[in-house]
Amino acid sequence: MQLSNNFLWGGATADFQFEGAYQEDGRGLSTHDYETDGSVQHPRCNTFKTADGQFGELPSSFFAPDPLPDGAEPCLYEDRYYPSHKAVDHYHRYKEDIALLAGMGMNVYRFSICWSRIFPTGDELEPNEAG
């Protein structure tokens, strides 16, 4: 099959799955940063610390909010793996990644940026340009 010369061939990426660099250039934390890895046998979880200092985790749900217990705050555990923290490190390797896409003949690329890169706490009046 012959494609026309103006055919757009491309790809797309999502910040959580691709970006990495979760604490660089003033980026704030988002709910996905507290989501662990998982498998069929052990689903992804959101980790937290209760008001009385107890650590806990609840299974993550893509389609519903993940409410934490009253008074609990999201918390990162040193012994857990959080995929979004490094991901595939597109934040540092974007030039190489785009060159790879171009090398495959792609001529368009759609990507998303984590909102907490631009507005680290969500309360800023001006965007974080470094993010």
Give the predicted meaning of each segment:
Residues 1-131:
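Non-catalytic accessory regions flanking glycosidase/transglycosidase catalytic cores in CAZymes
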